[in-house]
Regions:
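Acidic-enriched and Gly/Ser
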Residues: 1-135, 160, 165-184
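Short beta-strand-centered aromatic/proline hotspots
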Residues: 144-153
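Short, conserved beta-turn/loop elements at beta-strand boundaries and strand-helix junctions
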Residues: 153-159
């Protein structure tokens, strides 16, 4: 089970804390072009600021958050859940459950965001118009084996990967001959 956690302080501090407890975590990064002193450079920056994805059971996450709460002694919490605002808990309808992400969706997201390409961008559902909602798999190039929906973004055909409702990431341009229809098995 994968939980997404929102971190409040410095990303390296939160990641180090989770890893010190022996838990697996992932921070999605992006490669961005910047101009510094007239020179074009590629820098690494968080793709989704304040997000740290933790692969753990409910008990492990609860234990981690409890330890952080005890050690912070009333200071701002270093980590907290990111809550799923699309559903309510059955035992308490006024509260939202922590966001959990399916393993296959997380694997696909990690595969996409691990590629060193500055044209990978986070997007929202408002700017995407799926082309017939076609689900495809990329068959060639940097994004090979990434699957998602075809979309036209910034005037280019791209493949969009949805991690959870409202959290989408788009590849760089994908030519038509580098993708095929994806049939879920």
């Amino acid at each position: 089970m994968v939980y997404s956690a929102r971190y409040v302080w410095a990303r390296p501090q939160g990641k180090a804390l989770v890893e010190a407890k022996g838990l697996e975590c992932y921070v999605p990064l992006q490669y961005k072009h910047i101009n510094k002193n007239g020179k074009k450079r590629i820098v690494i920056a968080p793709l989704l600021p304040s997000f740290l994805f933790v692969y753990a059971t409910t008990a492990q996450v609860e234990s981690l958050l409890y330890e952080i709460m005890i050690s912070s002694e009333g200071n701002r919490k270093l980590l907290s859940y990111y809550f799923d605002h699309t559903i309510c808990r059955q035992d308490n309808p006024d509260r939202n459950p922590p966001l959990t992400i399916r393993n296959d969706a997380m694997d696909n997201f990690i595969r996409l965001t691990s590629i060193k390409n500055p044209h990978i961008i986070p997007v929202t559902t408002e700017i995407i118009q799926y082309k017939l909602g076609d689900m495809v798999i990329v068959t060639d190039g940097d994004f090979k084996d990434v699957h998602g929906r075809v979309a036209r973004i910034a005037g280019q055909q791209r493949v969009v990967v949805e991690l959870f409702e409202g959290c989408l990431v788009a590849t760089a341009y994908i030519p038509k001959n580098a993708m095929k229809l994806y049939v879920e098995q």
